[in-house]
């Protein structure tokens, strides 16, 4: 019946207010990457908490530091590495502080407790509410999806002054690997 609505194929260079141009698997991957970004770009402990891993204590609820600035978690490094690699490619992780922030310490994950990226200047909740992120599809094939995250910021960042919104565009790329879709280039409005 021609009166039934049908999904139209995603159009390159079209701007979207959501990620509807991605498949369900790709949207879930993006969500997982976004959730992981708070630890990958922010403080590593954020990711460990999100994934339910606990700090190893010395029995008195004190958190011992190992080496300089690292805390030990109750997960094997192999398990953690497998989980992070189910989201990101090595290429993507190499462009972050991953190798410095998360270390293999006698088979467990040691996390640098204070290393993090600064938030992008002008990142405010008010701007995000008034000007939510949008996306521009660049390429969508069976092997690769590229799109642009269009982020909005306030030049002044002050509540007292009127908004002076500016835009930064960030590339995002997903690639099909032998193990499924992975994020190969990733950015967020919060960390750039």
Give residue spans per PLM region.
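Short, cysteine-centered beta-strand-loop-beta hairpins and adjacent loop/turn segments enriched
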Residues: 152-166
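Compositionally biased, intrinsically disordered/low-complexity regions enriched for serine, proline
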Residues: 2, 6-9, 61, 129, ...
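Short beta-strand edge/turn micro-motifs at domain boundaries
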Residues: 148, 165-192
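Intrinsically disordered, low-complexity segments enriched in proline/serine/threonine
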Residues: 7, 11-14, 66, 134, ...
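Intrinsic-disorder/low-complexity regions
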Residues: 17, 116, 139, 183-184
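Intrinsically disordered, low-complexity repeat and linker tracts
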Residues: 1-21, 189-192
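Surface-exposed, charged secondary-structure patches
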Residues: 105-156
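Core segments of small alpha/beta cavity-forming domains
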Residues: 15-119
């Amino acid at each position: 019946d021609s009166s039934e609505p049908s999904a139209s194929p995603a159009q390159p260079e079209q701007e979207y207010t959501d990620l509807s141009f991605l498949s369900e698997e790709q949207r879930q991957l993006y969500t997982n990457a976004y959730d992981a970004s708070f630890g990958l770009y922010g403080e590593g402990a954020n990711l460990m908490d999100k994934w339910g891993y606990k700090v190893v204590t010395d029995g008195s609820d004190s958190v011992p530091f190992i080496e300089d600035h690292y805390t030990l978690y109750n997960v094997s490094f192999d398990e953690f590495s497998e989980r992070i690699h189910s989201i990101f490619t090595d290429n993507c992780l190499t462009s972050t502080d991953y190798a410095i922030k998360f270390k293999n310490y006698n088979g467990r994950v040691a996390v640098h407790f204070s290393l993090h990226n600064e938030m992008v200047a002008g990142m405010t909740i008010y701007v995000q509410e008034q000007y939510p992120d949008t996306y521009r599809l660049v390429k969508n094939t069976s092997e690769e999806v590229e799109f642009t995250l269009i982020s909005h910021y306030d030049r002044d960042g002050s509540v007292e002054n009127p908004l002076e919104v500016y835009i930064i565009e960030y590339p995002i790329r997903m690639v099909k690997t032998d193990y499924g879709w992975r994020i190969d280039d990733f950015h967020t409005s919060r960390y750039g």
